[in-house]
């Protein structure tokens, strides 16, 4: 697919826009002022594949904590600010690589200018974030409800405020929990601006519902070439957000690397604990950077044929199974040896 080329923006040592790879974001759910807990979670997320992390900054203590957090992590840190412009300034003074604000709830123009002046002085990007839930009353009335058009107008109004203050180091995010409204909003704003866009479906839900809604919404948006950073917002462990985001990007051909696991849905011919085996295989391959496909099949009758499009695979039988490589059965072995055999092949892949 052809991606839209947006304005290039530097966030710490990462670059978004300008045709650069789409980066994965998440958000910590620790108390930011708890430096040890926050650093530990950021490190876990980094290892899982997170490129940029956002931290809530609801207090001055949290803003000041960013300085120590920054010393101990390897990825850019974004400060999430609401209402108090002084927290935005403090976050930047204590090392935030980017701030996320909604100028509409920061206060007067003087307060917005105070934030922009510090960002300009330090060349720190500002993410202008607008959610459907915070849409201004006059725009709700103008468009007869909460609409994609209203969300886009709100976001661009905020952008123009900052541009009029002489600053354009900006990223835009517009979010709604209504998937189709969100898709339409991103289509509209992408046609009206060249700023990089952070995309996501807000308040998408728990692991199952959130993944489904995010996959549909992000898939529709990204497939049009729209988006420079993404977040899969889930109610749960943020590690799951990274797993889902990586899979969405790989499925759309927007990211290489990382093993894709495919498995059959089970049927009456299944002769092995396929669900358990597939989960163990997923856990096994998570740490490999290989750009290959691994198949996990439930029977030795159809398994080899169905796994022929995979680079590597296993198929289970009654107490035994097959190791399959490039569509060919290479070895028959006891069931308990399947996982070790698969690991050996991964460890020696390409030799």
Describe each region flagged by the PLM:
Residues 131, 139-286:
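Catalytic alpha/beta core domains of metabolic enzymes, predominantly
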Residues 60-81, 114-126, 186-197, 281-283:
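Alpha-helix-loop-beta-strand connector modules within alpha/beta enzyme cores
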Residues 19-37, 56, 75-83, 139-152, ...:
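Active-site mouth loops of central-metabolism enzymes
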Residues 1-27, 120, 283:
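N-terminal amphipathic alpha-helix/helix-capping segment at the start of soluble metabolic enzymes
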Residues 29, 34-35, 46-69, 100-108, ...:
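Glycine-rich, proline-tolerant flexible connector loops at the mouths of alpha/beta enzymes
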Residues 72-75, 93-99, 120-122, 190-196, ...:
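Glycine-enriched alpha-helix->loop->beta-strand junction motifs that scaffold or abut catalytic
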Residues 24, 80, 128, 172, ...:
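Conserved, mostly hydrophobic/aromatic
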Residues 86-127:
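Hydrophobic or amphipathic alpha-helical targeting/insertion segments
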């Amino acid at each position: 697919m052809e991606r839209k080329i947006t304005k290039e923006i530097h966030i710490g040592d990462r670059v978004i826009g300008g045709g650069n790879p789409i980066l994965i974001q998440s958000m910590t759910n620790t108390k930011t002022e708890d430096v040890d807990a926050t650093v530990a979670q950021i490190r876990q997320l980094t290892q899982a594949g997170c490129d940029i992390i956002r931290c809530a900054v609801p207090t001055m203590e949290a803003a000041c904590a960013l300085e120590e957090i920054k010393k101990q992590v390897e990825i850019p840190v974004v400060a999430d600010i609401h209402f108090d412009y002084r927290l935005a300034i403090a976050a930047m003074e204590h090392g935030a690589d980017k701030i996320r604000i909604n100028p509409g709830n920061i206060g007067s123009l003087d307060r917005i200018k105070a934030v922009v002046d510090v960002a300009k002085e330090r060349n720190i990007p500002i993410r202008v974030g607008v959610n459907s839930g915070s849409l201004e009353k006059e725009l709700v009335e103008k468009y007869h409800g909460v609409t994609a058009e209203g969300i886009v107008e709100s976001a661009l109004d905020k952008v123009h405020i900052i541009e009029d203050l002489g600053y354009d180091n900006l990223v835009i995010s517009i979010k709604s929990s209504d998937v189709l409204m969100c898709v339409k909003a991103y289509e509209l704003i992408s046609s009206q601006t060249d700023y990089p866009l952070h995309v996501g479906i807000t308040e998408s839900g728990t692991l199952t519902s959130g993944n489904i809604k995010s996959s549909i919404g992000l898939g529709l948006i990204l497939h049009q070439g729209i988006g420079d950073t993404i977040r899969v917002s889930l109610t749960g462990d943020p590690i799951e957000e990274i797993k889902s985001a990586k899979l969405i990007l790989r499925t759309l051909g927007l990211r290489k690397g990382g093993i894709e696991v495919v498995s059959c849905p089970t049927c009456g011919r299944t002769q092995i604990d396929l669900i358990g085996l597939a989960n163990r295989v997923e856990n096994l391959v998570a740490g490999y950077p290989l750009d290959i496909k691994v198949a996990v099949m439930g029977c030795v009758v159809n398994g080899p044929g169905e796994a022929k499009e995979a680079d590597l695979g296993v198929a289970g039988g009654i107490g035994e199974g097959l190791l399959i490589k490039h569509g060919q059965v290479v070895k028959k072995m006891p069931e308990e040896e399947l996982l070790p055999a698969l690991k050996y092949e991964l460890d020696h892949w390409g030799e």
